């Protein structure tokens, strides 16, 4: 098997403006900064306020001969930011994005989504579609994605192969679903459901056997409790206990209709937190998508167990209802929060669009709570799209910002030079870098993303 693609044979070096987050409230904008990436793709040095005349000395201090590799001097209106992290994405829904507006969640699944996902029984269709999906996300600067695949084992393996071949960091999960889906699109029985997930986990371990830092890992993925009976949930809980390095992802308190059906199926449990905890699927490795309607006890449980929330503001507000997750309250309680495109329930794969919608819905929440939950700032939304997402995915020791020792997953953003200026607000001569950064976040798009790096390797198509 081929190992994960790595950086080129030479280090990378940059001088210019570096922007990243250390916490939800600590955004660092670092002008005149020297950043050095070693040949393995790790950040070796980050030195703010660097005079260009001292760069050769810094290179030598880090063990390299000056002039052996070029230093990229970022133009005045350009900067580096960490790669975006999509904490919730349905890769098989790539071609159905934007469809089914106005439908309830369960009707959307039954009338549109299950039929589309069933197409992935065809491995050639899976290869074409997953290749396009991963290329598309990389173009948007999404360097890491947590993917739900379909129920098909062969197609799920293809998604993992595509991610690694194209250099995207990914969590890939085979969807477990043995009930409340059409007979032509559900697992044959509970035993088969758990068995195929076990096989996928083992396959990924063998897939990564020659790589001590794999980009692609498996994630345990019960679609939601409605689609999994107790035998499946119990079996997946056992897999989670036996594979302590793996994340767990599911949909959690997404819509009132879904929550009511879950209560009917599992009447012995007071709420979803108790349900998933009972089966060993709720802990610090859990990535819980949506989390709209949590009871007080559930919030306390998520905080105590250090669970992560994948906030999906586009899909939450563009289907049948306008649903607003209490993100400010989650942050107040120290609950990990990242952003998810939720493609294709979400119509956009742009993390810039997701950030903007997170800002919008938090403003609605502030109005709803009469100011008790203040709106998120633009800087906080940027944190959620980068370091917050890394925390949710259990990758913050490796990516999410430019701390020395982390891997260089980054976007080179251009706001003026060589960029079509018909969408982003024009950058004017007197604009401070803080103003330029906000213009990019609020009015920019993928045309402003000149380069995308994963572990030091340029990957944008």
Enumerate the language-model features and the residues they cover.
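N-terminal metal-binding scaffold of metallo-dependent hydrolase/deaminase domains
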Residues: 1-69
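Divalent metal-coordination and catalytic microenvironments
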Residues: 17, 35, 77, 88, ...
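His/Asp/Glu-enriched, well-ordered alpha-helical/loop segment
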Residues: 17, 278-285, 327-426
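C-terminal cap of metal-dependent C-N hydrolases
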Residues: 23, 407-461
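Alpha-helical scaffold segments that flank or form the walls of functional sites
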Residues: 79, 97-168, 195-212
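Active-site gating loops and adjacent loop-to-helix segments of metal-dependent hydrolytic enzymes
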Residues: 95-126, 179-190, 255-285, 305-308, ...
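Metal-coordinating catalytic core of metallo-dependent amide/deamination hydrolases
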Residues: 154, 158-291
């Amino acid at each position: 098997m081929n190992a994960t693609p790595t950086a080129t044979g030479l280090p990378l070096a940059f001088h210019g403006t570096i922007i990243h987050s250390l916490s939800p409230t600590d955004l660092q904008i670092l002008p005149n900064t020297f950043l050095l990436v070693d040949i393995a793709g790790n950040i070796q040095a980050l030195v703010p306020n660097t005079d260009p005349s001292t760069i050769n000395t810094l290179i030598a201090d880090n063990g390299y001969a000056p002039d052996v590799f070029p230093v990229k001097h970022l133009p005045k209106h350009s900067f580096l930011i960490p790669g975006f992290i999509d904490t919730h994405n349905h890769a098989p829904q790539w071609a159905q994005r934007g469809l089914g507006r106005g439908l309830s969640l369960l009707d959307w699944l039954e009338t549109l989504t299950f039929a589309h996902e069933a197409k992935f029984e065809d491995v050639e269709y899976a290869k074409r579609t997953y290749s396009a999906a991963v290329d598309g996300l990389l173009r948007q600067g999404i360097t890491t994605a947590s993917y739900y695949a379909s129920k098909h084992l062969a197609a799920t393996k293809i998604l993992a192969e595509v991610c690694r071949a194209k250099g995207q960091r990914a969590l890939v999960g085979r969807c477990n679903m043995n009930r409340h889906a059409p007979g032509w699109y559900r697992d044959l029985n509970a035993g088969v459901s758990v068995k195929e997930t076990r096989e996928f986990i083992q396959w990924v371990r063998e897939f990564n056997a020659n790589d001590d830092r794999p980009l692609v890992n498996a994630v345990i993925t019960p679609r939601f409790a409605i689609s999994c009976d107790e035998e499946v949930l119990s079996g997946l809980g056992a897999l989670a206990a036996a594979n302590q390095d793996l994340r767990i992802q599911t949909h959690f308190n997404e819509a009132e209709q879904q929550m009511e059906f879950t209560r009917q199926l599992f009447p012995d449990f007071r709420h979803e937190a108790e349900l998933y905890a009972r089966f060993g699927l709720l802990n610090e490795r859990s990535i819980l998508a949506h989390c709209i309607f949590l009871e007080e006890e559930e919030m306390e449980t998520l905080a105590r167990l250090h669970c992560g929330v994948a906030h999906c503001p586009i899909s939450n507000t563009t289907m049948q209802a306008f649903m607003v997750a209490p993100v400010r309250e989650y942050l107040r309680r120290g609950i990990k929060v990242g952003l998810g495109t939720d493609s294709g329930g979400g119509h956009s794969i742009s993390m810039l669009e997701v950030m903007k919608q997170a800002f919008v819905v938090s403003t609605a929440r502030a109005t709803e709570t009469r100011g008790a939950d203040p709106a998120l700032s633009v800087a906080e939304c940027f944190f959620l799209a980068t370091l917050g997402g890394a925390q949710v995915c259990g990758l913050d020791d490796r990516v999410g910002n430019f701390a020395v020792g982390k891997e260089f997953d980054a976007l080179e953003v251009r706001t003026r030079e060589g960029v079509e200026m018909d969408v982003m607000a024009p950058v004017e001569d007197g604009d401070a870098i803080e103003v330029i950064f906000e213009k990019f976040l609020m009015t920019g798009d993928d045309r402003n993303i000149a380069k995308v790096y994963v572990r030091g390797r340029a990957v944008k198509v």
